[in-house]
Amino acid sequence: MSSHRPELHITAQHGVLEAPAGALFTGEQWHVFHQYRSQPDVKKNNWGHVVSADTPFNWAHRDDVLSAEAPEVQVRAGSVVAPRCGDEAELFFTSVTDEGPSIHRALLTNLSGPQSDVRREGSVVDAPVLGLDKPQDFRSPCVVPGWADEDDRSEGHGGWLMLAVAGPMSAPELVMLSSHDQQSWTLDGPLAFHGDSGLAHHPILVSPRIIRLRDEVDGHVYDVLIVTVEADGVDLSGYLVGTLRGCDFWVKTPFTQMDFGHDFTRPRNTNTVRGVTYGNNERYDAALIFGLMNGVGRLDNPATHESLRAEGWANCLSLPRLTTLQGGLLFQTPTPGLTSAIPHTAHARMWSGLIDAQEGSVTVTLLDNATGRIAATITHSGHHLQLDRSMNPLHAEDSPAEAYLISADTDSLTIIVDGSTVEVFADGGVIAMASRVYFEGICGGFDVTAEGGASILRYFEVAGEDV
């Protein structure tokens, strides 16, 4: 019997998970909020809330924190921040009525308790609030409790910053807003790029996030802008590295694809409680990123998903990724604690190895225990990584996912299989791939081969209790 639902990844209990809405780590608990619909043919959606203690792998569902209230027709994704100590968080979300979207705020109290309380506090960003003559359709807020002292970026963070989307769906623009108290906001203007952004041929940018990381190579603190490009009905998520000053983003690294698998889009960073989650000297060392695994993005059709047909749910979030900045590039690896969590599952598996693939290739084959057939293959050939699921009858029309690797002293490969999800990290995390792979049963194991002069230097494997 198959079970497509993963055990370590976040899914909606039923219905369609549409987007990660916000994430918060308090130092003791992980809180992830997600936008979902209880049924695929229902327009109204909610903000779900899941919690995990210590590590982000053992999720418990809490009551929904937001649902559409008349005249709203939808509540969409935004940000969750905890600017101060205490058992509460601020929710910034997109409220949609028949007249269009605007950005609203709510206060969530009793955050760590079994049942949180939510108090809506109304619109904070819309045309009337900002004194504008006509609607601007503000949506998708990324809120940072403070941003930068430009004279000392390592200190930074005084006041509030909001990065949002405005304008029509066909021609959106990214805009910057600022506030001293998170309630009254000033529209500072559209975000402008200086230098080669790599986005000249991608006019539709959505789902923006901005974080700050210290580059491990030069020691400087940079701003990392994460965006999703909508092109021909398909999402492509990536990042730019540079320096944000007011509404101007000075580019160091142009738009770079963040994940090369079949099913990763609209990433969200995990916010923390300043001075509580991490010390001030650690706060720019790494970020924790979740992405949505749903195929093409906003225009994805959940009715085509085998998990919805067989089990009544569609889509999940990726595993959280520990994300660092090295030489202007993001490196993504599994969050610590995963190898300890997998043995407590029923069916999850992981294979991780150091390999030498400067000549030849190493291929890891995923086997379906119900049929004995190949469900997917992952091949590392030194400068090239491929995830191929086309031999699987449930993915027969799909082209392989491919990426080119930069030169590395040592090649490495980590593969996690959890239900119908497969996530791959290569060469220390310089390339990541997230793809759905459906099994008629479950993943029955890894068959690893080295060819053409390649070799496996060392490896380890962990698996759930029932495999």
Predicted regions located by residue number:
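Beta-rich accessory regions
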Residues: V217-D218, A231, T243-V467
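Beta-rich carbohydrate-recognition and catalytic domains
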Residues: M1-R139, P145-A200, R214-F260, Y278-Y284, ...
